[in-house]
């Protein structure tokens, strides 16, 4: 049995693992991929480093490997809590005394013609990172959930216009205060068109929308599914945690994008550090009680 199992091998999860391991805890990291960070072409707002998201993620993983923290490239399918935690993946079962949910936000890439072609050429995955590049221009957000609204709100502060492209979905609801700032377009998308950069969106009814930038914001935090099933509090599609990054379930922590707030590498690393140090205290206190 591990002291802590960390679900997610992004900045939050790796950060927490470094603290846990150096404090003498047995830790296991489980993660299927690097998530949205892998798609970031260049990150220029992280302290001391200008590199691609993938390069930053790989540096963190190397740190964990140097400390001999085991990392399993597996998909978690269920988490059960009964005094201790049982984590089932598509390959194995593991047990731990504490769990950190740090899978970030599962940003789904829709199968739309042109989306791969224009990645980094007008198609982005982070409004806070790249929004300033589109000051006073027409932009769009591709998505239909809370994350899409979050990105649209960020862009509304700098862009000339912001359109949420739901790609045929009609379940998105805006607060009254946002209806004057954000346009909802529920048409199904046929393809993205451009030359060296993206220029327009073509819909299946052959109408077009001139656009200078598109921000992909499909999906919600995958950690939420596990948190909800375990009975953790959820608010606005984010896991509710206290200042210790702990949920209302003893031993269950969450850090990074799945807790909401500023969705940045720097905050994910910080939350992971807090979670890691608090998990250390949790494990030590429980040992003393026994």
Locations of regions flagged by a protein language model:
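FAD-site-proximal beta/loop scaffold in flavoenzymes
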Residues: 106, 111, 117-133, 218-262, ...
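Short glycine-/acidic-enriched loop or helix-start segments at secondary-structure transitions
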Residues: 16, 39, 110-112, 135, ...
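Beta1-alpha1 glycine-rich phosphate/pyrophosphate-binding loop at the start
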Residues: 2-55, 63, 137-171
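FAD-binding core/adjacent interface of flavoenzyme oxidoreductases
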Residues: 1-5, 71-137, 213-215, 239-247
């Amino acid at each position: 049995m591990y002291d802590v199992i960390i679900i997610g091998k992004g900045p939050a999860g790796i950060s927490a693992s470094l603290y846990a391991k150096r404090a003498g805890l047995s830790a296991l990291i489980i993660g299927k991929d690097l998530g949205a960070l892998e798609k970031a072409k260049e990150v220029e707002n992280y302290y001391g480093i200008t590199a691609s998201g993938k390069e930053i993620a790989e540096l963190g993983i190397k740190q964990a490997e140097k400390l001999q923290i085991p990392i399993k490239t597996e998909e978690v399918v269920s988490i059960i809590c009964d005094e201790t935690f049982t984590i089932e993946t598509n390959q194995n079962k593991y047990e731990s005394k504490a769990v950190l949910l740090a899978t970030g936000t599962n940003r789904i890439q829709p199968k739309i013609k042109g989306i791969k072609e224009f990645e980094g050429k007008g198609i982005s995955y982070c409004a806070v990172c790249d929004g300033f590049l589109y000051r006073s221009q027409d932009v769009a957000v591709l998505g239909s959930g809370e994350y899409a609204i979050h990105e649209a709100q960020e862009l509304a502060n700098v862009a000339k216009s912001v359109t949420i492209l739901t790609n045929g979905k009609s379940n998105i609801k805006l607060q009254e205060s946002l209806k004057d700032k954000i346009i909802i377009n529920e048409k199904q998308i046929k393809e993205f068109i451009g030359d060296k950069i993206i220029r327009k969106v073509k819909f299946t009814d052959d109408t077009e929308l001139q656009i200078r930038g598109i921000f992909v914001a499909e999906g919600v935090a995958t950690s939420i599914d596990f948190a909800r099933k375990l009975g953790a509090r959820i608010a606005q599609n984010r896991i509710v945690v206290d200042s210790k990054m702990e949920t209302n379930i003893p031993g269950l922590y969450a850090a990074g994008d799945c807790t909401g707030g500023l969705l940045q590498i720097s905050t994910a690393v910080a939350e992971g550090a807090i979670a890691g140090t608090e998990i250390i205290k949790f494990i030590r206190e429980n040992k003393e009680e026994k």
